[in-house]
Amino acid sequence: MNLLPVPVAALPPVVLGVELTIDLNEGLRRSLRTAFGMKTRAINLRIDPSMDLIFLCEKTLPGTLPCLAALTRPGVIAVTLREAHLAWQPDPEHPIGRGTSTLAALESGSCFLTANSRKIAIASFSERNIHPTHVTMEMLGRPNLLEYLRSDWFTLEISGTNRRRLTRPLAFSAVLEFDLQLNPEAAEA
């Protein structure tokens, strides 16, 4: 007997929101000089200046988050990403103006989930998806993410490149919406 999953529209989406911050770029050259006592000339020869524009934000989360409780119900056979976006979190001490870090400082990036020593790219964005207050990400296929999100701990990572160096930390929320699919027998019960 071949079982078909319940249509996606039958269940409300599961929404995961995670606050992240891209810290102020100290400058790779300066941090290496401070940490290792290297001379500036040696550093200039070995480090590409564009490395200062690479960012990585990650947060390790428990699989027991209340927003993920629907994943533990009987009969859930698949979880797929429906939508993903980044939302800017303005710094109340620094109103929008010159020198304010917004999402427009980003150039491109990807979103990954990691659990049980396995990592999967689930969404990405490029210049055309970026606005000062939000970034719409494009899904990278529709892989089943159930085992990632049901694990004891999983890591959400956003990484990519900036257009320019940040003058202040950049705070934002990564918001992921997931569709659940149920085994038809469990849906009827």
Question: Where do the protein language model's features map onto the residues?
Answer:
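Beta-strand elements of well-folded, non-transmembrane domains
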Residues: 22-26, 83-92, 113-119, 160-166, ...
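Cysteine-clustered segments with highest specificity for TGF-beta superfamily mature ligands
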Residues: 123-182
